[in-house]
UniProtKB/Swiss-Prot annotation:
This is tRNA N6-adenosine threonylcarbamoyltransferase. Fe cation binds at residues 112, 116, 306. The gene is tsaD. It comes from Anaplasma phagocytophilum (strain HZ). Its EC number is 2.3.1.234. It is found in: Cytoplasm. The lineage of its organism: Bacteria, Pseudomonadati, Pseudomonadota, Alphaproteobacteria, Rickettsiales. Required for the formation of a threonylcarbamoyl group on adenosine at position 37 (t(6)A37) in tRNAs that read codons beginning with adenine. Is involved in the transfer of the threonylcarbamoyl moiety of threonylcarbamoyl-AMP (TC-AMP) to the N6 group of A37, together with TsaE and TsaB. TsaD likely plays a direct catalytic role in this reaction. Substrate binds at residues 134-138, 167, 180, 278. NCBIfam families: gcp_kae1, T6A_TsaD_YgjD. InterPro entries: ATPase_NBD, Gcp-like_dom, KAE1/TsaD, TsaD. GO terms for biological process: tRNA threonylcarbamoyladenosine modification. The keyword Ribonucleoprotein does not apply. GO terms for cellular component: cytoplasm.
C-alpha cells in the first residue's frame, strides 16, 4: 500500500479532508463548502473559522471510516499552514497537531499555493522544471517550479486577483457567490463582442496582472446600461470573459519567454486554482500554450478549487523529500510566499 497520508485544508471557506497513498490512490475525500458566505457576496473570516471548528472533526471521522483505515495506518499528517485566513488556518493546524501528538505520526506544514502547483503531478507526467500559473480567489501569479519547495516568482497581480474580479463582477450583476461558475454559466449564452473592456498591461513587457481597471469598466457599463435584462447580463459576462482571456494570453506568452530564459527545456505550463476550472479559459490557455510550443496541463476541475487531495499530495511530495517532521513548533502563516518555502 505504500505511505498513506491524511490531508487537511482549512485556509479559506472550504473544510476539506483526504486520505491517499504515495501512488495517488485516493481512499477518501470530503469537502464541505460554506454556503453561508453567499449572503454576503464574499468570505466572512469569522464565519469561516467557526464552520471549520464545527465540522473538521466530523469530516476527518467520516474520511477515516470511509477509507477503512485507522490512525495507526497513517504515515504522516499534512495540513495547510498558510497562506490564508489566519483564523481558519489555526483551526486546521491545531487539529492536525492534536492528531500528530496523539498518534505520534510526523506532521507536514503545507504551503497552500504549493499544493495547488503540485496536485497536477499526482496523475500526470510532469517533471521539473515547469511553469505554473495560479489563478484563484486570493492569488494570481506565475511561478517557475525548480523542485519541491523551490520556486521563483516571475510575476503576479499588482492589485486584485482574477478570482476576486470574477466574484466582484458576479456581485455587481446579482449572480451570487462564488462568482466564477455563475459568470461562466451566463457567458455561455452571451456575446463576447457586445462590450469592449480595457486589457490592462496588454502586449506590454513583464508577467504582472492588473484587474482593478477591468472591474471598474464593468461597473461603469452596468450603470450606463441601466436596468439589465437577461440578455444584457449574459453579454456583460461573455465580454468580461473575452477580456480576461486576452489578458491571460498576453501574460502567458511573456511568462513562457521569461521562463525559457531562466531554464532550458520548459515544455509544461501547469494552470491551477479555482479559476482554472473555467472551461472557456482552459480552451484559450491551451491554444496559447500550444502556439508557444508548450503543453498546458490542468488538474481535474474538482481539484482546481480548494480540496484535501492537493494538500495530502503536497504532503506526499514533501514526505519523499524528507520534510515530514515530528516537531509541532510551526505556526500558521497568513502570508507565506512560495519563494520563501525553503
Amino acid at each position: 500500500m505504500g505511505e498513506v497520508l491524511l490531508g487537511i485544508e482549512t485556509s479559506c471557506d472550504e473544510t476539506a479532508v483526504a486520505i491517499l497513498t504515495d501512488s495517488g490512490e485516493v481512499f477518501a475525500h470530503e469537502v464541505l463548502s460554506q454556503v453561508e458566505h453567499s449572503a454576503y457576496g464574499g468570505v466572512v473570516p469569522e464565519i469561516a473559522a467557526r464552520a471549520h471548528y464545527d465540522f473538521l472533526q466530523v469530516l476527518v471521522k467520516k474520511a477515516m471510516s470511509n477509507s477503512g483505515l485507522k490512525f495507526d495506518d497513517l504515515s504522516s499528517i499534512a495540513v495547510t499552514a498558510g497562506p490564508g485566513l489566519v483564523g481558519s488556518l489555526i483551526v486546521g493546524v491545531m487539529f492536525a497537531k492534536a492528531v500528530s501528538y496523539a498518534t505520534k505520526k510526523p506532521i507536514i506544514a503545507v504551503n497552500h499555493l504549493e499544493a495547488h502547483a503540485l496536485v497536477a503531478r499526482m496523475n500526470q507526467e510532469i517533471v521539473f522544471p515547469f511553469l505554473v500559473l495560479i489563478v484563484s480567489g486570493g492569488h494570481c501569479q506565475f511561478m517557475l517550479a525548480h523542485d519541491v519547495g523551490c520556486y521563483s516568482k516571475l510575476g503576479g497581480a499588482i492589485d486584485d486577483s482574477l478570482g476576486e474580479a470574477f466574484d466582484k463582477v458576479a456581485r455587481m450583476l446579482g449572480l451570487g457567490y462564488p462568482g466564477g461558475p455563475a459568470v461562466e454559466c451566463k457567458a455561455k449564452n452571451g456575446r463576447g463582442d457586445r462590450f469592449f473592456f480595457p486589457r490592462a498591461l496588454h502586449n506590454r513587457p513583464g508577467c504582472d496582472f492588473s484587474f482593478s481597471g477591468l472591474k471598474t469598466a464593468v461597473r461603469y457599463a452596468i450603470e450606463r446600461e441601466g436596468p439589465l435584462d437577461e440578455e444584457m447580463v449574459c453579454d456583460i459576462c461573455a465580454s468580461f470573459q473575452e477580456c480576461v482571456g486576452d489578458i491571460l494570453v498576453s501574460r502567458i506568452r511573456n511568462a513562457i519567454k521569461a521562463a525559457r530564459q531562466l531554464k532550458e527545456g520548459i515544455d509544461k505550463l501547469v494552470v491551477t486554482g479555482g479559476v482554472a476550472s473555467n472551461g472557456f479559459l482552459r480552451t484559450i490557455i491551451s491554444q496559447c500554450a500550444e502556439d508557444m510550443g508548450v503543453t498546458a496541463v490542468f488538474p481535474p476541475r474538482e481539484l482546481c478549487t480548494d480540496n484535501g487531495i492537493m494538500v495530502a499530495w503536497a504532503g506526499v511530495e514533501n514526505f519523499r523529500k524528507g520534510n515530514a517532521v515530528a516537531s509541532l513548533g510551526f505556526a500558521p502563516r497568513a502570508r507565506w510566499t512560495m519563494e520563501s518555502i525553503s
